[in-house]
Amino acid sequence: MPPKFDPNEVKTIFMRAVGGEVAGGSTLAPKIGPLGLSPKKVGEDIAKATKDWKGLRVTVKLTIQNRQAAVSVVPSASALVIKALKEPARDRKKDKNVAHSGNVSLDEIIEVARTMRFKSLAKELSGTVKEILGTAFSVGCTVDGKNPHDVQKEIDNGEIEIPQE
């Protein structure tokens, strides 16, 4: 006999989804089917919650309590950097492995670092900014027209001041 259903129990599920697209029922069913939820309905909720992240892969946090699913987006550093590039949404099925050759201002990088501060292991905001600069390098964009590695060196040498918080 299966265990009794506890209405106060909260289950949390993290999964990757493409922003603005309805996740396939086949990928959701094994995770949320046993919890008594409709995979199709949860897929539509995920698509609604991620419409701001169209075409980008983001982590979605499903909080399930009393057979109700609450969807929240947990963006990755790369998704935030790509969003800061303000590139138009592209067709995911046609374009694969696209290099993002745009330019991001240092202020936007600092904003992304503030958003990602809770995930960072750095002691100060400048360390988090350097983490995000590393992500910007791997995404392939420039920061204020310079290579992100050069900006990191300038922060280390004290040429660029990063606010404390």
Curated annotation (Swiss-Prot):
Key word Iron present: no
One of the GO BP terms on file: cytoplasmic translation
Glycosyltransferase as UniProt keyword: no
Main location: cytoplasm
GO cellular component, one term: cytosol
Gene3D superfamilies for the chain: Ribosomal protein L11, C-terminal domain (1.10.10.250), Ribosomal protein L11/L12, N-terminal domain (3.30.1550.10)
Other notes: There are 2 genes for uL11 in S.pombe.
Function: This protein binds directly to 26S ribosomal RNA.
Protein name (record): Large ribosomal subunit protein uL11A
Organism: Schizosaccharomyces pombe (strain 972 / ATCC 24843) (Fission yeast)
Gene name in the database record: rpl1201
